[in-house]
Amino acid sequence: MKKTKFFLLGLAALAMTACNKDNEAEPVTEGNATISVVLKTSNSNRAFGVGDDESKVAKLTVMVYNGEQQEAIKSAENATKVEDIKCSAGQRTLVVMANTGAMELVGKTLAEVKALTTELTAENQEAAGLIMTAEPKTIVLKAGKNYIGYSGTGEGNHIENDPLKIKRVHARMAFTEIKVQMSAAYDNIYTFVPEKIYGLIAKKQSNLFGATLVNADANYLTGSLTTFNGAYTPANYANVPWLSRNYVAPAADAPQGFYVLENDYSANGGTIHPTILCVYGKLQKNGADLAGADLAAAQAANWVDAEGKTYYPVLVNFNSNNYTYDSNYTPKNKIERNHKYDIKLTITGPGTNNPENPITESAHLNVQCTVAEWVLVGQNATW
């Protein structure tokens, strides 16, 4: 009889352990407080896909942490607010994320959430599901109802009246104008026929939280099938077709480019891997494709490859005498989250056969950039 009693007690203990484990996986708090959060996103701009997709919040998730442990988590679809999240009074950490897709967040510790990463994808290039985050925020919850982003005139504890700001993890780089104005030395001799726009040396992975989102992952992506082995070319480099676009003449309301992740190439010494936006096509002489001695001479000058094709690369947000920036902006030699880099390119002569080598100060290009947040950076480039 005693053995049977101990056996049943053991089964009950195991059952309780299983229940506790389930509760840790899906935090449910029968606390004495609730919090409701209203979100503010950056304004949308003209996207490569549907314009509003840049700012669309398909899924908003709010997590409340008591120390390292997740006390509550709640999500809302196609919404910019999450209401009545059940938790307990006291000092807590609030974490807000949007467009996390299939990412599993339930039960994660605060440290695990802060360590999350994302990768650049084909879906990003149509502005769909651009992930957004706000830095973890320390708050003090009072018993009863708590609010962030609501008018302070109603009931409850209004922690902040302003909506919580959330920012895209991605940046956008795009040509908004490309024009050919050959200088006197090349005018009426050479012409350029654009065929493709490429994104080169794009970081594959990014952190989701932190003062900088650049991490130590050494993988990069390119839209070109050509192996350049230039001074900027990274060792871990993979081709993806979605960093390549057939050429369409860009305009302010029809930008041509790509969404990318943070990349820092501001080091004063050593090897750097700057993110590049590049237009590619044929260099022609007297209206005809280069051939024979003309092709050989252009190759010897490092203007074209064996097929007579040339590249006009623009190092995004880079400090160069060939580049000018709008509004007295100082280039930072890095890609920053939630920025859009709008580039006007003027071509004044032949390009290069290796877009992943440093450009010379006498390159045949002018670049004008505009930077904004969805910080616009306006960059003007002249080749």
Swiss-Prot record:
A lipid is attached at C19 (N-palmitoyl cysteine). The record marks R46, A47 as: Cleavage. Keywords: Cell adhesion, Cell outer membrane, Fimbrium, Lipoprotein, Membrane, Palmitate, Signal, Virulence. One of its GO terms (biological process) is cell adhesion. The keyword Coiled coil does not apply. Residues 19-46 form a propeptide. A lipid is attached at C19 (S-diacylglycerol cysteine). Pfam families: FimA4_C (PF22492), P_gingi_FimA (PF06321). Changing M1A: Abolishes FimA biosynthesis. GO terms for cellular component: cell outer membrane; pilus. Synthesized as palmitoylated precursor. Efficient export to the outer membrane and integration into fimbriae requires lipidation and subsequent proteolytic removal of the lipidated propeptide. InterPro entries: FimA_C, FimA_N, Fimbrillin. This is Major fimbrium subunit FimA type-1. It comes from Porphyromonas gingivalis (strain ATCC 33277 / DSM 20709 / CIP 103683 / JCM 12257 / NCTC 11834 / 2561). The lineage of its organism: Bacteria, Pseudomonadati, Bacteroidota, Bacteroidia, Bacteroidales.
